[in-house]
């Protein structure tokens, strides 16, 4: 599929390759391709410094994604793959990498809606946040020191927002106080697309499965240790992903369950590369 925003199957986008330059960082490469550097770490069999990856390294840029299960309308925020999906209509979609709440400040699951849009928002740190960091002022004016960035979408869940950030490297990580952060350029796009009243569904699907061109795929996500806070206790172990993978694949395959190569499913879980992997038996 050549058009990243067109929906004709359960998958959108196409993976590409990139060869690093001397001045590159994984953070800059990720942002230039609208993914997170955690996506790059997961998708590639590399052990490199995100700040100095070196030159002439060929990297897979994971731009292909299986759409989450669920009604395809409004905004779906999947904390399982750290991505936000906005369904503009039944045929087109925008999707962006996100950062979410860390351990103890988990982003809540469930339905909400956008109740307010604000350019250059002022941040009023909640008392719970100020207890953690007493040096914070009661009000943070709009500007480069404001962690909300230059756009904010306020949710019907009290104190939770979809917003930009003044620390783009936090996109793709679980480091916030529960809000959903996007790259500055992505929140500007989303801000212009959506209106007040748009439905938001926050889900947790670290494993997704779906069809493209009569081929069945699985996509398994497990965050690299590098991007996790040491206090994170809510990370699902890979051993716990196997039964979930079987359940998800069975749901996606339906009556075509006999075409599934379960060894490929097991391997996909073990690798957890965060990219769609075809899981059909040969000649099926």
Residues covered by each model-derived region:
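Primarily a LysM-type cell-wall glycan-binding module
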Residues: 3-34
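Short acidic, glycine/serine/threonine-rich helix-capping segments at coil-helix boundaries
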Residues: 18, 42-55
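Loop/turn positions that initiate beta-strands
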Residues: 23, 54-59, 197-203
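Short, charged beta-turn/beta-strand-edge "cap" motif at the junction between a beta-strand
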Residues: 25, 64-68, 120, 205-209
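Structured segments of extracytoplasmic/periplasmic soluble domains
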Residues: 32-36, 43-46, 62, 87, ...
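Gly/Pro-biased beta-strand-loop elements
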Residues: 65-168, 192, 220-284
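Flexible, glycine-rich surface segments
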Residues: 155-206
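N-terminal targeting pre-sequences for secretion and organelle import
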Residues: 191-233
């Amino acid at each position: 599929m050549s058009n990243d925003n067109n929906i004709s199957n359960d998958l959108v986008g196409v993976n590409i390759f990139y060869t690093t330059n001397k001045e590159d960082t994984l953070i800059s490469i990720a942002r230039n391709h609208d993914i997170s550097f955690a996506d790059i770490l997961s998708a590639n069999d590399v052990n490199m410094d995100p700040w100095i990856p070196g030159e002439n390294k060929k990297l897979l840029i994971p731009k292909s994604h299986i759409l989450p299960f669920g009604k395809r309308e409004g905004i779906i925020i999947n904390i399982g793959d750290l991505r936000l999906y906005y369904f503009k209509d039944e045929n087109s979609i925008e999707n962006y990498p996100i950062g979410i709440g860390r351990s103890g400040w988990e982003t809540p699951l469930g339905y909400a809606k956008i109740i307010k849009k604000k350019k250059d928002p002022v941040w009023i740190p909640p008392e719970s946040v100020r207890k953690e960091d007493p040096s914070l002022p009661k009000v943070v004016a709009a500007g480069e020191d404001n962690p909300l960035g230059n756009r904010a979408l306020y949710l019907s869940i009290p104190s939770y927002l979809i917003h930009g950030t003044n620390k783009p490297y936090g996109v793709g990580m679980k480091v916030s106080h529960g809000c959903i952060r996007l790259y500055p350029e992505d929140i500007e796009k989303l801000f212009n697309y959506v209106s007040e009243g748009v439905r938001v569904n926050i889900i947790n699907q670290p494993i997704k499965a779906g069809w493209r061109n009569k081929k069945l795929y699985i996509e398994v996500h497990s965050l690299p240790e590098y991007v996790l806070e040491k206090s994170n206790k809510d990370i699902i172990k890979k051993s716990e992903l196997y039964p979930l993978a079987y359940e998800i694949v069975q749901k996606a395959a339906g009556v075509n369950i006999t075409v599934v190569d379960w060894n490929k499913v097991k391997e996909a879980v073990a690798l957890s590369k965060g990219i769609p992997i075809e899981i059909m038996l040969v000649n099926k």
